[in-house]
Amino acid sequence: MRSPNAKRTRCAQALAGLTIAVLACTSYGADWIVSGNDGKYQRVEGRDTYPDNPKPDTLTLLDASRFPPQVKVQVEVENGIQGPPQAVAITPDANIALVGAPTRYDYAAKKLLMDSFVQVVDLQASPPVVARLDIGSHPQGIAIDRSGRLALVACVDGSVAVLGIDGNRVTLRDTLKIAQKRLAGVSFTHDGRHALVALRDEQGVAVLNVDDGRVTDSGLRLASGVAPYTIDVSSDGKWAVVSDVGLAGLPSYAGKLAGDADDVTLIDVSHEPFRAVQHVTVPSLPEGVAISPDGKWIGVQAMDGSNLTPDNPGRHARGKVVLFAIRDGQAVKVSEAPGGEAAQGIAFTADSKYLIVQFNVEKQLAFFAVNGGHLRDTGQRIALSGGPSSLRTTPR
């Protein structure tokens, strides 16, 4: 059995030089993005496996201000693929990263264990320091506001953990119960006055009020498709988008699925009350969704049957990356390209020119050019030691 603490120490020491390089840079001009990577899990033709002698889970820090993006830091953490690919977050100054979805695999019992802490990664320490903050339930989606002082964590028990950030110190301020079952993704609105939370098992999207660090449930619920999962909000303050992963995202669903189409929900957040205005059909299991910082594009990463076993008629070898334009208040499909096998998260670079997609099975980050609405795989890849499973940019 590997010793997580010993391995974490060795990895941190080896990466000290990289951390110093980051310390030499300022956040000005950088485009910081974090990827959480599951080293213990491997999907093999649609089947979950946990190979012996796994590599550690990791957090990778990228600077995407130039193309191709560059890896600046990698540090060992505890992170799993189970849940929405938004279980990481990073402060605007890139000093602190938060990591959720902590999982361990018990090889003797052949059972996955889920922990109830958020990891606080001090990226400015040399080597990086990882601390744990218990929040009482298994954390899924994480979001940090643009001030860098407040974070929200959506949990599997239906609660939202409210975290305060002061320098490199993170504390649990409050726990807000908004549902009885699992939550998934969470995102702040651009002005920081609200947050949207995906009610994965109970359906719909909850709207929270945020006032000077105090978070309350507004009581407003927005329509979604089945099993709302990931959420992103545009930097122009106009739109939010939610991926709805369908029956496959419901708890203990026992039926056989053959890659049915799912959908993405477009929400108008330009004025209150917020309102869902469109449900757009996409290929099955849209794990990741993102809105470009300039508010023009929506990127969707859909598995499209690439998560299914070879005997399933809905099986495809690769998923799809789909691009929509936002025109006259509606999302219009303009392009698509082959993606990875059972891929996960997706994010735009700060200049809105590229999409970063997590190719989980291939253990790669892939880069697609938006090209004015003509999606193109650049062929650029960043190899990772584990399957990438969560992806977030700094708050924009």
Predicted region positions:
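Bacterial N-terminal signal peptides that target proteins for export
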Residues: 2-15
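Bacterial N-terminal signal peptides
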Residues: 14-24
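Predominantly soluble domains enriched in secretory-pathway, periplasmic, or organellar proteins
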Residues: 25-396
